């Protein structure tokens, strides 16, 4: 499986007072970063002070480790495609600059996550392609080194209607699942439609289309959705600026433009970077926002951070430039436009949801084993990011089991018991179904079953319509 670059202790950080007023870093090229005020990146802060470091991974084309604006910002850099982690394309350095360029140092640009230190994994081959195997190794490396957020600004055409272009990689999903299980948030670009057979393209790329991954689309200075940005009613979660972007470039690339004074910045770079555009450069802004939330509260889970970012977004509408955006969550911008200040306020107001201790458990292979004859607990589902939960129960032939799920407000559930022979929900067919819930009194979904064979059965709880919420699940097995 190959992917392409989607081109189209403590550190100085931000203090959050009870009633914040915007701070303006003194970086001289900040005025060229139109996306910073658009994201309200510094609007929730009125001072620069010390906050805990958050490790952020950039899985990309490498990085200029000696760039002046990244001095002291890179903890580790490694190539997973041979050679050095040096950035031959510029893509990874550009992304790294958006997130973690030094802030308020009187030089260059300002990164949007002042508390971020970088772990850079190079996964781009000399021909510009990426193997998912290299990507998966880089993800696991970053998790091992303590990353809390991983930015992946790469992907390929995804067409779920065409078996030759599904874009799915089991290796990639396993690496992402492992990262989520360790409390890491993965942020990914939803992709550009450059190679799509029709435009706009209606499907987000992988890994943005995986559960628990925050998929990010692009909009321009006029506030409208970028024509190149992939759409998706489920997997576009947020939108952030992605046109006429300004950031860092390796100085080996900018030195070829000798008449330009801003060496090391995209204004001096090759043509495709002078006014860089692409969902690749939208995702890092969300990554930076996530890093800020983790720095303010290291106890947050990845799903709590994604929820805060999603629900604090500014809804996109014709009033703020999105001509075709309908009310509510939509396929063009997801929950809306990134609003970092609003996310910080939501965190301070205690709006993060209760974490689900069973996640990730979105498929049979990572389903959570439930032991003991009786179990009763609460968990959550999210139609857009966590539509299904799987619990594994061991039954003997002839043993009886009763399952009952009570949905919270605004939730509609289906509960299915799958036979031991089914290895993945993606392969689910009627022949594997052992039982299915029937909606009973009080809205409770329930069923009873007597096992016809020994083995590990799978209880799937899924939401059947758009919504987010908590449910209670009760499982009782006979002796």
Set out the residue ranges of the language-model regions.
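C-terminal subdomain of the subtilisin-like protease fold in secreted/lumenal serine endopeptidases
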Residues: 8, 22-23, 32-33, 40, ...
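Protease zymogen maturation seam
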Residues: 13, 20-55, 68-69, 268, ...
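Peri-catalytic substrate-binding/gating loops that frame the active-site cleft of hydrolases
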Residues: 33, 40, 61-86, 114-127, ...
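Subtilisin-like serine protease catalytic core
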Residues: 42-78, 83-133, 145-148, 209-212, ...
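Acidic, Ser/Thr/Pro-rich low-complexity intrinsically disordered segments
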Residues: 168, 303, 333-336, 376-479
